[in-house]
Amino acid sequence: DDQTLAVCVSSVNFISGPQTLELDTLMPLCQKVGAQLFVDAYLSVNVQHFSLEEYNLQQAFVAAGGAKYCQMGNGNCFMHVPPGRDFRPIITGWFGCFDPLLDSPASRPVAYSDDATRFNGSSYDAMPHFRAVHVLDFFRERKLSVDFLADVNHRQLELLAKRFKALDVPESQIQLPVDVEYMGGFMALKTPFAQSLCEKMRDRGVHTDYRKHWLRFGPAPYLCDEQLE
């Protein structure tokens, strides 16, 4: 309603794993009531077919990180800032590019850059950025495009789902409630024994993790079918 200031969603539920469906319908609804839209795309970038244009998110704030699927390690994050957003940062630093000579609607008492750099903070360790450059070069050299990685991930999820269904385990014990078509980059099984199963599998050299009653399997492009099975 018109009391809503912002809508914050994730492109993928990080606990149970399904994609957020109809993500492309949110921006018009937010614009209708004057609310800002923020999307956490961390679990979509570099593992799914995800683009601002496809999901109608050019006017939304969209953030993601370099760890996990981007393979950049910790310390890298990035955000798409819609053009023309001149909000004043609450937490800032000299990387916010403030300049008293800028002719900006937000120029008093301190003027910030007119572009997305106004949301930069204070001094930070820039080494992860250099690491990210080498990672991106590696991806290009090996022709590891987003489309290729997304296709590999989808096929791996299909394999995991097929192997699980073949076990024919009672749904009262463990179940797969999300079809592969609607999964994010990982498969999550719902079970009251998530923690104990995760620990027992780790003892056998199978690395998974769990969130509450969800046991999560995250395939990677460097794993072959035999390893997944």
Residue ranges with predicted function:
Residues 56-108:
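Active-site PLP attachment segment
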Residues 195-229:
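PLP-dependent enzyme catalytic core of the Aspartate aminotransferase-like
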Residues 6, 36-38, 61, 186, ...:
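Structural preference for beta-strand elements that scaffold enzyme active sites
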